[in-house]
Amino acid sequence: MADGDDRGGKRTPQKKNVVVESNGRAYVKATFNNVIVTLTDQYGNTISWASAGKMGFKGSRKNTPYAAQKAGESAANEAYELGLRRVDVYVKGPGSGREGAIRAMSESGLEVASIRDVTPLPHNGCRPPKRRRV
């Protein structure tokens, strides 16, 4: 191997210099098990994302409003540093962290222009899972 060849070593991920418009979209997917927050530009290109699992929560703690708040805060701070200022929020799913994620994004400095619920509703499609007996 040559002296300048550094294969096999750990690579440090480099931040891309992304030019971000001030307007964008925030997608909050709140399932029964996790919360995923994705911030994109107007064209759907991802600027930043975070989930309760990425924030270090495991198991049943991932679907708490506090975990959703931390995920929303992390994604919003990263996008704010890149220049995002105003978002339209699209919420999907029945999870408990919907409001917490939106509140955290607005407290992080992002202006929430609108909130839309895009939860898919079946027109009597698949049979739902059986009820839990605890």
UniProtKB/Swiss-Prot annotation:
UniProt xrefs under Gene3D superfamilies: Ribosomal protein S11
Alphabetical keyword list: Ribonucleoprotein, Ribosomal protein, RNA-binding, rRNA-binding
Sequence intervals crossing the membrane: none
GO molecular function, one term: structural constituent of ribosome
GO CC entries: ribonucleoprotein complex; ribosome
A Pfam family reported for this protein in Swiss-Prot or TrEMBL: Ribosomal_S11
Assembly behavior: Part of the 30S ribosomal subunit. Interacts with proteins S7 and S18. Binds to IF-3.
Descriptive protein name: Small ribosomal subunit protein uS11
Organism: Salinibacter ruber (strain DSM 13855 / M31)
